[in-house]
């Protein structure tokens, strides 16, 4: 039986505080952070326990998806994990596939919504690595409307609302990682796709109160997409809301932007404003999410004609 490769790609995270500077430098395309910038990032990692669980979670996700795919028995799958900013790199994963004799592979980023500035850059790295010697790649651009993914999102929003005293009056905020605002002039689908998935969840649950916002914007001179989550919290407090549910629909695992930006920074601001903030559980390697990702890969296999 021929084995079909799966190139599963994720952002990556430092394994210890000693790796933070190299990680940050890689994100900044070789420009080292200033001492103040580095100290601030280290402080945030220390606040969540010294290291992000993202690497371990991503590895568990990859193993679980491979298990579900191979349980079908029709095709043999092998999942290879490639990170954008840490080891193992995307190019390393492609080289491993080539070494193992993989001729075809589905390439999937663990981010449901497409942007040329995010998912698109992963695919560029993968295609470049596979250009000489393969394997042949079929890249999945987006999967934000995958039915099982939407079901998983909806169940987590519903679960979070049950923790509110007055769930019918709570505001649900669908957030995602902000990107430079210039994507709006590029015809980039990122904003529209985030609205599509959020609206789909709201429709499933019959939500009366929901809105969209951004978080974790980069600290650069150019403008980023807004409004920011902290700004939204201030507006909602002025409007008389007392409970909010934050659904970080653009993320599929616990990491710094969830554990610090929401669980510490946003919750602290909410408390100052007299708001109760409930954050939806992340997908991590929960079976419903794993099955959703497996569905995406199986559909991609059919679409590729493999």
Language model features by range: what are they?
Residues 1-306:
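Active-site-proximal alpha-helix that buttresses catalytic centers in soluble enzyme cores
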